[in-house]
Amino acid sequence: MAAWRSTEHLQDHFLRHRRRLRVASVSAYVASAEETIRVGVYFEYRDPETDEPRVGYYDPFTGRFVGLSDNEGEILTRFRCSERYVMHALPGSTYV
């Protein structure tokens, strides 16, 4: 399973996205990311800031998105968004 870059990176993302994801703890945030990777739709895209290749998983039933490094070894971000976002706002998205 993919890991977060660091404890600080995980904590920062948890604090930014916890309310919208409705999770009360870091462990629930991590479990939610792992579940999204398990059940979500795989797609590829390019990072909007760095243009680096990325892998995404999106669960259209919950609106949960996880962005990973291109080798899927590192979780880079985790938040809730619309299907339209993963289709059209992420550069080069292969999500259908």
Model-identified regions with their sequence ranges:
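Compact soluble domain cores
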Residues: 1-54
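Low-complexity, compositionally biased segments
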Residues: 12-16, 20, 50, 62, ...
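Basic/aromatic recognition patch in beta-strand/loop cores that engages polyanionic ligands
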Residues: 45-71
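A short, surface-exposed interaction/processing loop segment used at functional sites
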Residues: 66-96
